[in-house]
């Protein structure tokens, strides 16, 4: 509005000079004073004003306050073309005044009798009228900037008026509801985002879209996990990672599949935690999503059923990774298919059982690692005799070595020692033997020891250096009297033994190691040794003694 600090303005309606000075009266107060003096037309116009106009005066501004001099009627001032020209509410900031008088009160009466379409048209034409002053306060500007308008159709007329009266109005922002065509898109989008935030993606500050946090999957379930493997499975484009609970002797495992962008697509658990959830776990901002998964996991445990009746942990009703869990049904987390977990897992890892190489829990929850000894020997044969008895239970080819690795277990009952034997990749003559664990028993007697199979010497010959005297005939072998179910061979492998005796209620020299189960440990060397002992005993009987030679020479 082009006004000066002091001056006179000559109008066609009133030829009296007037001097304008700035005071505390506002434009709203002038409209209210004219309503009391001039009639009811102004009150009707006041009812048509935008509902967002403040009822309290704004701060002091040179361009928004003026005062009429003494003796000048406010009704005459409102009829002056200084404020209004021949058009309906043009901008008074052009500085050009019309030459003819214009009274806006008949226009108000005509506009009040028009229909709703006329009001919308008048509002559209009124949208050009705006003050170019600074906002009343920064708080008001922020409020009007970040609060989206809500259409009257969704709120109702009364609620819409009350909301518009409560919202502050800034001069730099176009009043809500003035331009219905331009804000049509915002009227439809704002309520959808306010009421359907779960269906529509949330808009981040940078303009990107992020999935709602309630729909994200997180691997943080409150327990501590250690990753021990990852591979690409058949039928899935996402890699699969394998985790094991770090608590000592806890059998719980899980596998996690992630997409290429890092999002978790599937989490499958196996086993039940045998301990409470640790307190000092590392939590992040996604802990709320983990709580959602925990509640869903408890439902999954009660729905599908776990392996035991103990308290359920998050999504623990599913399965592990096919190492030694054979034939265990494992419904996947999130569905009730009940498909087998071990369908695509290799069978070559069944030798590794739970807790192998992981340590033994001692008093005070201390974990003691099992000792591991690696021995390298240059040999042409794979089987090396170390004094213990072993049973082979597996073989596979490991990464980095084309030579197969064989796995053995100590045959002594209750002994936890295992070993695996393989040839080095750089030298085929080098045999690498790795021992895990410690024997809890003594070294068994050697298989080739004759003391296992020889009977105790007689009491009369116990003091002699040789168990048999030179002139004593060899003991007769045991001759079975019943029918012989096995053929006896004279070559020492199935024939009669040189020493008779009964061990444990059964004859010991009658049948060979190939025919008797007790003789499975007898080797060819032992048979040969027995034959040699028998031959030496027979020669001692046949050869004459030295005393007989001297007696014959005397005669």
From Swiss-Prot:
Superkingdom of source: Eukaryota
Pfam families: WRKY
Keyword terms: Abscisic acid signaling pathway, Activator, DNA-binding, Gibberellin signaling pathway, Nucleus, Repeat, Transcription, Transcription regulation
Keyword match Nucleotide-binding: no
SUPFAM superfamilies to which the protein is assigned, alphabetical: WRKY DNA-binding domain
Gene3D superfamilies in the record: WRKY domain (2.20.25.80)
Sequence ranges of Pro residues compositional bias: 51-61
Comp. bias intervals (Basic and acidic residues): 347-356
Comment, domains: The WRKY domain is required to bind DNA.
GO terms of molecular function: DNA-binding transcription factor activity; sequence-specific DNA binding
Tissues with expression: Expressed in aleurone cells. Mostly expressed in aleurone layers and leaves, and, to a lower extent, in roots, panicles and embryos.
Biased composition (Polar residues): 277-294, 310-320
Single biological process term from Gene Ontology: response to abscisic acid
Keyword rRNA processing: no
Function: Transcription repressor. Interacts specifically with the W box (5'-(T)TGAC[CT]-3'), a frequently occurring elicitor-responsive cis-acting element. Negative regulator of both gibberellic acid (GA) and abscisic acid (ABA) signaling in aleurone cells, probably by interfering with GAM1, via the specific repression of GA- and ABA-induced promoters.
Family membership noted in the UniProt record: Belongs to the WRKY group II-a family.
GO cellular component: nucleus
Originating organism: Oryza sativa subsp. indica
Induction info: Induced by abscisic acid (ABA) in aleurone cells, embryos, roots and leaves. Slightly down-regulated by gibberellic acid (GA). Accumulates in response to jasmonic acid (MeJA).
Amino acid composition bias (Low complexity), ranges on this chain: 163-194
DNA-binding region of this protein: 214-278, 379-444
Protein name, as recorded: WRKY transcription factor WRKY24
Residues covered by region (Transcription repression of gibberellic acid (GA)-induced promoters): 466-555
Motif Nuclear localization signal, residue numbers: 253-259
């Amino acid at each position: 509005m082009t006004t000066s600090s002091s001056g006179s303005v000559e109008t066609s309606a009133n030829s009296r000079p007037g001097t304008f000075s700035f005071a505390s009266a506002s434009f709203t107060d002038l409209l209210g004073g004219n309503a009391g003096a001039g009639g009811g037309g102004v009150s009707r116009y006041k009812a048509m004003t935008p509902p967002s106009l403040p009822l309290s005066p704004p701060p002091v501004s040179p361009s928004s306050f003026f005062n009429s001099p003494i003796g000048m009627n406010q009704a005459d001032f409102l009829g002056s073309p200084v404020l209004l020209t021949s058009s309906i509410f043009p901008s008074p900031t052009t500085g050009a005044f019309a030459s003819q008088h214009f009274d806006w009160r008949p226009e108000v009466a005509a506009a009040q009798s028009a229909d709703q379409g006329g009001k919308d048209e008048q509002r559209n034409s009124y949208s050009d009228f705006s003050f170019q002053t600074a906002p009343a306060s920064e708080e008001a500007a922020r409020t009007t900037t970040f609060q989206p308008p809500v259409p009257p159709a969704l709120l109702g007329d009364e609620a819409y008026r009350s909301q518009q009266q409560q919202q502050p109005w800034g001069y730099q922002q176009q009043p809500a509801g003035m331009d219905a065509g331009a804000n049509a898109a915002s009227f439809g989008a704002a309520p959808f985002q306010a009421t359907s935030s779960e269906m529509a993606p949330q808009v981040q500050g940078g303009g990107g879209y992020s999935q709602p946090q309630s729909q994200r999957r997180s691997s943080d379930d409150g327990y501590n996990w250690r990753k021990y493997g990852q591979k690409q499975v058949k039928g899935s484009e996402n890699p699969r990672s394998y985790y094991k609970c770090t608590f000592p002797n806890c059998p719980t495992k899980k596998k996690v599949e992630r997409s290429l962008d890092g999002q978790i697509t599937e989490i499958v658990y196996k086993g039940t935690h045998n301990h409470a959830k640790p307190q000092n776990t590392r939590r992040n901002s996604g802990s709320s999503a983990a709580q959602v998964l925990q509640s869903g996991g408890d439902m999954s445990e009660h729905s599908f059923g776990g392996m035991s009746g103990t308290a359920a942990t998050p999504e623990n009703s599913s399965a592990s990774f096919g190492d030694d869990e054979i034939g265990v049904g494992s419904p996947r987390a999130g569905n009730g298919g009940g498909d087998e977990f071990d369908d695509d897992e290799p069978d070559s890892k069944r030798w590794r059982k739970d807790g192998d190489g992981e340590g033994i829990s001692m008093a005070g929850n201390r974990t003691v690692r099992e000792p591991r000894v690696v021995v390298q020997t240059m040999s042409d044969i794979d089987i090396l005799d170390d004094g213990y008895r072993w049973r082979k239970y597996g073989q596979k080819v490991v990464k980095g070595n084309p030579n197969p690795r064989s796995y053995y277990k100590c045959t002594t009952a209750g002994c936890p020692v295992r070993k695996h034997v393989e040839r080095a990749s750089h030298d085929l003559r080098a045999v690498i033997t790795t021992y895990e664990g410690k024997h809890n028993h003594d070294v068994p007697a050697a298989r080739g020891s004759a003391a296992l199979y020889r009977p105790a010497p007689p009491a009369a010959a116990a003091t002699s250096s040789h168990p048999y005297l030179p002139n004593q005939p060899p003991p007769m072998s045991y001759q079975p009297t019943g029918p012989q179910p096995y053929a006896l061979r004279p070559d020492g492998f199935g024939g009669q033994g040189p020493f008779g005796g009964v061990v444990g209620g059964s004859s010991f020299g009658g049948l060979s190691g190939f025919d008797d189960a007790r003789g499975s440990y007898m080797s060819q060397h032992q048979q040969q040794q027995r034959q040699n002992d028998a031959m030496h005993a027979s020669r001692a009987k046949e050869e004459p003694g030295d005393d007989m030679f001297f007696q014959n020479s005397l005669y």
